[in-house]
From Swiss-Prot:
Organism: Dictyoglomus thermophilum (strain ATCC 35947 / DSM 3960 / H-6-12)
Compartment(s) of residence: Cytoplasm
The encoding gene: lon
UniProt lineage: Bacteria, Pseudomonadati, Dictyoglomota, Dictyoglomia, Dictyoglomales
Record protein name field: Lon protease
GO MF term (any one): sequence-specific DNA binding
Positions with a binding annotation for ATP: 360-367
Residue ranges of domain Lon proteolytic in the record: 597-778
InterPro entries xref list: AAA+_ATPase, ATPase_AAA_core, Lon_bac, Lon_bac/euk-typ, Lon_lid, Lon_proteolytic, Lon_Prtase, Lon_prtase_N
Amino acid sequence: MEERELNQTQDIPEVLPILPLRETVVYPQMLIPLIVGREKSIRLVEDALSGNKLIGMCMQKTPVEDPTPDDIYRIGTVGIIVRSLRFPDNTLRLFVQGLQRIRVIEFLETEPYFKAKVEVIEEKVEKTVEIEGMMRNLLNLFQKMASLIPQFPEELLINAMNIQEPGRLADFIAFNTNLNINEKQEILETIDVKERLQKVTYYLTRELEILEIANKIQNEVKNEIEKSQKEYFLRQQMKAIQKELGEIDPREMEINELRQKLQEAKLPPEAMKEAERELERLSLMPPGSAEYTVTRTYLDWLISLPWAISTEDNLDIKRAEEILNEDHYDLEKVKERILEYLAVRKLKSDMKGPILCFVGPPGVGKTSLGKSIARALGRKFVRISLGGIRDEAEIRGHRRTYVGALPGRIIQGIRKAESNNPVFMLDEIDKLGSDFRGDPAAALLEVLDPEQNNAFVDNYLGVPFDLSKVMFIATANVLYTIPPALLDRMEVIELPGYTEYQKMGIAKGFLIPRQLKEHGLEKEQIEFSDDAIRKIIREYTREAGVRNLEREIASIIRKVAKGIAEGSITEKVIVKVEDVPKYLGPEKYTYGMKGEKDEVGVATGLAWTEAGGDILFVEALVVEGKGNLILTGKLGEVMQESAKTALSYVRSKLKDLNVSYELLEKADIHVHVPSGAIPKDGPSAGVTIATAIASALTRRPVKKDIGMTGEITLRGKVLPVGGIREKVLAAHRAGLTAVIMPKENKKDLEEIPEEVKKEITFYFVEHADEVLNLALLEVKESAEQRNPERIG
């Protein structure tokens, strides 16, 4: 190649193609090989080869594939392509001779490759005695470094000794010394030659110290290791080097980082003592061992738990009440209990969290109420399902000796909440099981005991964790499957099934708006009439909650949404009562309605079911026989005994009823409760059966508008029963105008909606004689007269 005097500024064009380099710095007067593979770079090289072969080379700040001007350093080197070679994979191997430093003034083009306006940086330095001394010192250091590196190329040392220019000497030594890429770029950007010599001297001195220490270490440990310990030797070398340089060993750095995190986590003294002990063990373990991973995981769990992190309670009682009312309809008892807790919490800041148990049938909002309580209190919410859990370790955790051991669900839930005072819901607590692996219910005793849970010990953690600030809320469908000891620790709040009035309110205030939102409709597009909602409740659902009601409403809204999307519906849809079958098909359920006329031997009872209440007709018939009692209708054992008691009571009153004893000796009494396929049980039909039998024997009709409930004794006393709320609502729905119930159940009327109480007359009785006087038409004056208390 021809010699060209390209070191003169006027020979370098003002505009140069700029080749971005990754992890490579080119110095002036240095010959360097480059591999070019990017499409833009290949195009740049090809154009340069067809021209003056001059290119600007600047290193990228980050090794991105497609750099922008902001990704490129502004100080670089202009060079000339000496030789190029194309490889089969279309990459180019270049040999480039660096010429002079350049500064990129501005980028003019980015496509098809970078072009920039540049200026050549000229070096003007007088070779003073000080500069000469710095050059000799640098050469001495370079010679020492060469002597410490086996197989160091001798020609590099000779070339360095023949360089007379101070700037070029600094560049040459920097290029051939093991500096990191940022340090090499720093040398390139140091324009002042004296300063450049100083920096290279500093870096070379540091590199020389590292080499001397490495050789010293190598000599010290050479006789102590064998070939199989090569990895250990390298680690020892690295550790010693880092120690001499004042750097920290990665292992030590990890231990220090863990110790710092433990301090920040504010562990209590006992937990901190255990953590320090495990940390000390960790520092002595080889990182590749299984025990190392187990211990590290354990420490991570200790660090991640919210030992001292609490959310601040929202003590604004009015605001909390608004939130509870926004999310749930009615449920006044539950809301009142939460507001009471807030009031006491406001007065006594260190009050322990209550432990509540919501009991009620499915779909009444137990789980969603927990979320609402958390929102009202301003706390985090976490829920775990206990249904089907049979292993105690699910609650208390596994010991760390087991492979894959983890904390129990309580501690996992606390970590998930990231707070030590969340609202913690234990869903389906009545469905806990037990087997040979232990009893989870017994493990929950400690969790739910306010006197013990301030030091709950999970088997995995092995140190106490304070659960006293947590508000635990358990949910259950029934109470009888919950162990008594566990039940005793919880404050039980019953969530009875919703009444028809409540379901109407929930449907209009919550379900319909929510389903409209989920289906992308506005309230201006569809409206439900009250009668239509009532028909859906009565004839298309039979449940205590509102889940199926929401499904049926969603079904109607989907059909309307389809019509709107297809364009067949353009006006507002009003769903009327007669439209419901069109959307949902034939009715799925029927509720009993009152009889059409007063009948002999047919009394109207009131029954409680899991889906609410219903009326129950009891039929009695006197047939030829031998004085036996025949019972049909799939009656349970308690109900059969109640029927026998009712018959015995009526027999004791035959004289008062003007019925001869001979009639019973020649006849059987057949008592039947319709819907024979459905099991029925309980004592509350006693007065109804007695009334039906008395009517059949006396041939006196029973009033069709009156319903009754109550347990009967042999002496005719009427005892209190349960489910009054549901029974009265069923009577109202069936069109009954009067209800007979035990006097001791009078207190239960508080749960009955006022609009229902206004339309029903209530008779409170203590004796079955009163029931017969009220229910049977044309009662004889000879019967013992009583004056039952009456409301209505």
